[in-house]
UniProtKB/Swiss-Prot annotation:
Subcellular location, principal: nucleus
This protein's GO CC annotations: nucleus
Species whose genome carries this gene: Arabidopsis thaliana (Mouse-ear cress)
Record field: compositional bias (Low complexity): 41-52, 99-119
Name of the protein in question: Scarecrow-like protein 11
The keyword Ligase is annotated on this UniProt entry: no
The protein's role, per its UniProt record: Probable transcription factor involved in plant development.
Amino acid sequence: MDALLQVSVDGFRFENGSGSCCKPRNNLESGNNLFPDFHESQNQSSPNDSPPTVCLDNSPVLKYINDMLMDEEDFVGISRDDLALQAAERSFYEIIQQQSPESDQNTSSSSDQNSGDQDFCFPSTTTDSSALVSSGESQRKYRHRNDEEDDLENNRRNKQPAIFVSEMEELAVKLEHVLLVCKTNQEEEEERTVITKQSTPNRAGRAKGSSNKSKTHKTNTVDLRSLLTQCAQAVASFDQRRATDKLKEIRAHSSSNGDGTQRLAFYFAEALEARITGNISPPVSNPFPSSTTSMVDILKAYKLFVHTCPIYVTDYFAANKSIYELAMKATKLHIVDFGVLYGFQWPCLLRALSKRPGGPPMLRVTGIELPQAGFRPSDRVEETGRRLKRFCDQFNVPFEFNFIAKKWETITLDELMINPGETTVVNCIHRLQYTPDETVSLDSPRDTVLKLFRDINPDLFVFAEINGMYNSPFFMTRFREALFHYSSLFDMFDTTIHAEDEYKNRSLLERELLVRDAMSVISCEGAERFARPETYKQWRVRILRAGFKPATISKQIMKEAKEIVRKRYHRDFVIDSDNNWMLQGWKGRVIYAFSCWKPAEKFTNNNLNI
């Protein structure tokens, strides 16, 4: 555990093309281990115990997620939730100090059930309760307070730490399967059994465990999709009175806690109302999760998504496997990741590179993100770099991380520091749709970014994106296509998420993953509309025009990806190939597409065609 918490940052360089840099923080050197048994077992194993492969077990991701949670505990970020966390911690330590002035004795008595070498220790709920109840000695030191103040103080002491600790304990359990990219064979078989039981349809055509039967009758009596279309037509024709009447009718038959159709209608009605009033609350200006959403909740929602939907799992698997095959003989590997965000894609690849015959290559990652609002536009990507660095140190992978936080179309080739002796990979997964196209600017920032990809002259360009047709400049055309697209997604979550205790996470997932984009598509116009998807055939034309040619996805990768979907997920998920694209969808509708590309003409150092 000490090795995970006290990692040297020597040789860890941060370089930001936008000019804002930060130094590694020292307060990440200590924290609380949420997976103690896991780390002990991992420290006893050797990286050479098994042959090199990609995504065989979930230990890399568990380490990575545990690291993120410790960062959440120990580091005061710019988000409001981080400040609230730190306030809760300060209150917790104030309580302990108030219980006894002799901190050494209190520490020794309260650490019988915990590790003594932890700088920030969050005891179990039982320990908290006993310590807080048996506080008579400390209470005698505050007899100048009246009885009412003592009661309020006791309530504060008893409630706040228990809530915080129980939340972290619950999160530790739920995050064990946060990514299904890496699984052991035994875990695969167990997961397959669970999914098979959950996916068996009943006579109503829904999976077992669904609790929305009581709401089906109401949905069948009112055609909510038709009402939404009529409301959108009224909005498009500026008939505010008719649009308001339709909105009232939709709200009477929709709910954020109903079945898939009811939830779709509820959120689309909110988007239509925002378009009418011009008031979007909360404001939607970028694809990032809301600043009021904590990292804890984001991880819970992400865990639920990868547990019920294979999109990210198979795309990350295919991307990592393709990069690994390219890097089998490379001595230096440079990955330029456009849209690195939290870095969930990389733990399994790093683990595989550590087991490569002959040792791992020198790995350099350039993480690129859009700037955050506030005084620290690069804060998120810097934190991702620190976590990846500590993770690489665990597996002895030589690592260097550079970051850039600025609009992608403004990035220059010099900022990326491409070295001729490196094997270079450009990675862009599910993020290019958020770059404006020619309908916003005649120069087409989207084509500018693709041209930058080509100027990098990569050995491999890994690309995945949403297959969507709701990017029309005409509102009604865009609305109808968005209605079809999101109907499939809400139906997918409605079918695959059964447990009632997951409904809260489903609501968060839909709000942050689906509703933000839908709100942008429906309520915004011009440059304010940040979600601009295209079909995979349209992406193909753009990428070919930028100077790339398709790279064949190996049959082995396609076979293993299909096995992942078949064994772990609902039978209505589909995966197929078309003209060097790996396509994924739900009930026959293609939703996501993945492909690999290479430069049509490879350039030498002197920019000569070869």
